[in-house]
From Swiss-Prot:
Glycans are attached at residue 259. Residues 68-259 form the BURP domain. The keyword NADP does not apply. The BURP domain located at the C-terminus has not been identified in non-plant proteins. Disulfide bonds: none annotated. Seed. It is found in: Secreted. GO terms for cellular component: extracellular region. This is Embryonic abundant protein VF30.1. It comes from Vicia faba (Broad bean). Keywords: Glycoprotein, Repeat, Secreted, Signal.
Amino acid sequence: MEFAHLTVLSLFCLAFVGITATSSGEDYWQSIWPNTPLPKTFSDLLIPSGKTNSLPIKSEELKQYSTLFFEHDLHPGKNFILGNTNSVGSIIRPFTKSRQGVTDSIWLANKEKQSLEDFCYSPTAIAEHKHCVSSLKSMIDQVISHFGSTKIKAISSNFAPYQDQYVVEDVKKVGDNAVMCHRLNFEKVVFNCHQVRDTTAYVVSLVASDGTKTKALTVCHHDTRGMNPELLYEALEVTPGTVPVCHFIGNKAAAWVPNHTADNLCVM
């Protein structure tokens, strides 16, 4: 599998987790990527009980995941207001099951309507590879196995809290067909990792209305024939299979891509 070259900037680094290396998962991380702090996105995987006391994606954060737009909208000066569709239930499964199975927005699970089995044991689409992991070691093993190398990087978003109006400052292409790992929206800590086919990933630098600068991982789907037609029409007034469609990825997910530089693993 070939990926586009990833230019790594220090500004793409996630806030790092200030914890000591006491868990076997973090020790395993350090054994593969020495002196590399654990990304905040994956910190839930270190919770001893494997269960939190609340859902990881708060109601005010849902807009990070429910914003659809065109690929040609990704340019400096473009204004975005998060949440241009009210059909959160459709965002959960933006593709029809008959064509692409459970895909890249499954982390928006409503625990009262879906179960982990719906996401982790449902049939996969043709050429789709997915795994549910509940430990940091399992995630590391899965992505290394997929790429056949430890020279990989994880990239994520850092949307500002309580901000939903942004202006694009810069756009950088990350690569094609990345492996996405999403924190499922259940109290039990589970990430769903899968390859996103026929897509291009970008890192978009944004400036919030209060001046806060953030970065957003963005995925553009080039094959939208299996997309939910009602969702597409509500958000963009287009039909499936006509134009590429993009969406932001919220703070509780990351994209794994090859590391073509000599830098340490670096994530936004």
